[in-house]
Amino acid sequence: MHTVVVGTSGTTAEDVVAVARHGARVELSAAAVEALAAARLIVDALAAKPEPVYGVSTGFGALASRHIGTELRAQLQRNIVRSHAAGMGPRVEREVVRALMFLRLKTVASGHTGVRPEVAQTMADVLNAGITPVVHEYGSLGCSGDLAPLSHCALTLMGEGEAEGPDGTVRPAGELLAAHGIAPVELREKEGLALLNGTDGMLGMLVMALADLRNLYTSADITAALSLEALLGTDKVLAPELHAIRPHPGQGVSADNMSRVLAGSGLTGHHQDDAPRVQDAYSVRCAPQVNGAGRDTLDHAALVAGRELASSVDNPVVLPDGRVESNGNFHGAPVAYVLDFLAIVAADLGSICERRTDRLLDKNRSHGLPPFLADDAGVDSGLMIAQYTQAALVSEMKRLAVPASADSIPSSAMQEDHVSMGWSAARKLRTAVDNLARIVAVELYAATRAIELRAAEGLTPAPASEAVVAALRAAGAEGPGPDRFLAPDLAAADTFVREGRLVAAVEPVTGPLA
């Protein structure tokens, strides 16, 4: 099994996905252990002084003015974890919790938090044992980090609360730790706070959303090309010289992807004799512009994610010169904004996919295709209701595009009077990405059926299109014919898209797509 080494200088998106989704093991580097030990010496020295230091010898938030004596400091650290583990609602997904834990370990290992090496090692041990703390949907305002979600994870390190074992069974955390030979941690000065104070939940969800959206944007370039072909549209609008004079990078990439898919097609430009078209509809003609703008947004979000992955988010932080300073780096605004931006572009991508699907099904706009791509229209309804499902998904995505980060509710007696709502932005983006895969799948299913109907008329689809049709049919999504139970076909198309098999089906013909 792949092992991810956690050092002092952050991590990569690829490592987050490897740990969160694929169960990669984690290991602390020697440099990380050294940095942890050095920072802990600084915290211990400060703890021995009479002056109050936030997070070391004071209360938290609005209670920071209370100086805590040495005899109560271990209790203080336990109490912050217990009291802040106040999440409610459904459990969040295992991969989200694993990303959250791994990213907190990444920050702890930087040597800027003052956590002891043995606590960091326990964090790694819990991940490697496949133990997943029970974390709830609601509880984070995305400022002072994802406090409640991280608190539930810290509670597991203490042997308290509930967690899911590698077999999927939820048990008391103490039992699971004992079963895997892991001793619960006894928190000391600053450690409880350091385990809670980060943007790790929203960042982990951003990283995984980007991985999914990269696949979906390439998939949507393919389905746009298939729809253009099925509608007998022109591929002249994809010419490189047209996109060079408006040089948005993503636009050129999407146009190139579509051109590669359509190479060798006998359908493009094959207009009806009685209704020649000078221009195709916007949803067909402007696909590179819309898809490409979304691609550029992904690149911007990835830039923000990369910076955050290289960051050490805590408050206070331990600096190399020995100072321990309060700061505002826990504010989730940078991550929250791009999470909301991605929800907007995902909604618009879903919208343009649905518009092309509707055009394929409308006999007045499909240029010779049967109504709803039905076998015997009237007796058969064809894909009529598949578009209803797609429209319902698009409608929800438009609601999910409303920014969470534009909201802020003051908390902690107005000490924390502006928050990012980044966790909420991340949660709704996960739903949006999930919906987008289904929307792309419906367009794929409709476009491949339409292409098969064109082929039955004697027209020759592009080799890449033929490869997609063959692969999708082999995956269990059947082709044209009388009405049948449609949900299994749509589910097969959905899985085909999500697993990257659509992209994999065309690349042997087109070469690698971006």
Swiss-Prot record:
Annotated crosslink 5-imidazolinone (Cys-Gly) location = C143-G145
Q: Which positions bear 2,3-didehydroalanine (Ser)?
A: S144
Q: In which pathway does it act?
A: Amino-acid degradation; L-histidine degradation into L-glutamate; N-formimidoyl-L-glutamate from L-histidine: step 1/3
Q: What is its main location?
A: cytoplasm
Per UniProt, which keywords does this protein have?
Answer: Cytoplasm, Histidine metabolism, Lyase
Q: What induces it?
A: By histidine.
Which EC number(s) are documented for this chain? 4.3.1.3
Which reaction does this enzyme catalyse, per its entry?
L-histidine = trans-urocanate + NH4(+)
Q: Where in the cell is it found?
A: Cytoplasm
Q: Which InterPro entries match?
A: Aromatic_Lyase, Fumarase/histidase_N, HutH, L-Aspartase-like, Phe/His_NH3-lyase_AS
Return any one Pfam family short name.
Lyase_aromatic
User: Among the entry's GO cellular component annotations, what is one?
Assistant: cytoplasm
The protein's GO terms of the molecular function aspect are: histidine ammonia-lyase activity
| Modifications made to the protein after synthesis | Contains an active site 4-methylidene-imidazol-5-one (MIO), which is formed autocatalytically by cyclization and dehydration of residues Cys-Ser-Gly.
Report any one BP term from Gene Ontology.
L-histidine catabolic process to glutamate and formate
The record's comment on protein family reads: Belongs to the PAL/histidase family.
Among HAMAP family, the record links this protein to: His_ammonia_lyase (MF_00229)
| Name of the protein described by the UniProt record | Histidine ammonia-lyase
> Which organism was this protein described from?
Streptomyces griseus
